[in-house]
Amino acid sequence: MRRALRRRRHARPARSEPLATDPAADAEPGDSPAPPSHRHAPDAATDSQVVLVPVADTPHDRQRVTGTDVHAWLLDSDPAIRWQVFADLDRAPAEVVDAERQRVATEGWGARLLAVQDPDGTWAGALYSPKWTSTTYSLLLLHWLGLPTGHPAALAGCARLWDGANYFEGGLNLAKTIRQPETCITAMLVLLARSFGHDDPRVDQAVQWLLDQQLTDGGWNCETVRCGSQHGSFHTTISTLDALHRYETTGGGLPVGDAAQRGRAFFCDHHLYRSHRTGAVVDPAFTKFPFPPQWHFDIVRGLEHFRTADAERDPRLADAIDVIRQRQRTDRTWPLQRGHPGRSWFRLEEPGPSRWATLRALRVLNWWDDGIRA
């Protein structure tokens, strides 16, 4: 089946200035935007130190699918998309997947991010803020793009994070003015360390601290340490589950499986995105799934965790699956959704059909449907 592609008549000029910073980008990772007193303190670097590198559009940035060959459209893209199509949709041989994944470091989005790394190993001269150009969020994007484990630039960035953090009995924080550990940041740094192969004994200590912070409902919450909250946060819980899963699948020495199972039960009890008391949607934003998700929870990110963990297809997740199906367009793609406000090094996709949304939705639906048929 042949596909037709339509190009925009005029390419959008490359950005030479940072994207506008929205205050919501600095909100604490909780169930709702945090008040100003609960926002992460910025690092020493200021917004004026962030410089965006102008990047010209590439042909696949401008293409629009008008036929039904979605698979070919997905493959006509960046290596970060292609290797994940090979791995998750095609189930291609490992050597095919690995060969394509290696290209993330030398072509496209991955190469662009690596090119703007500072000589000292940071990004934007800062560890956690500004969002989303700091070292933490640049490394998170490289993780989602699939930069291979052991890449020297990622290891240098991880070293800066782990050496620059403040430690509190295993938990850590990157903010200079908050003298308490932060669960989301601890989880993100564990995820990055295990994703890129950063070897540090403090990783095990951080994992043990995360295990100790699990709440009786199975979730985690950044505000437990600060405010004594005893109800899990969707945002904190998904970040912690992703970290524990990566720790377990990369040979971590601590037993985390039971804690992860209880964390997934937390989401099942909430039908993934609803109040366990009223059944109402906790936040309408949970039903949208921009890429990258940053520290935010959404239904696709939640289901991606269940997929990668090959967890049970709990019937209480069916509601969220239906929401994703309903978002599919008539051309069998899913549209680009507005990203979380903040600064970006460059735009990943233009408005219209989104390869990231389509890839992520398709592999979640395939996982669900395969399990139901079995």
Residue ranges and their predicted role:
Residues 22-31, 38, 43, 47:
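Asp/Glu-rich intrinsically disordered low-complexity tracts
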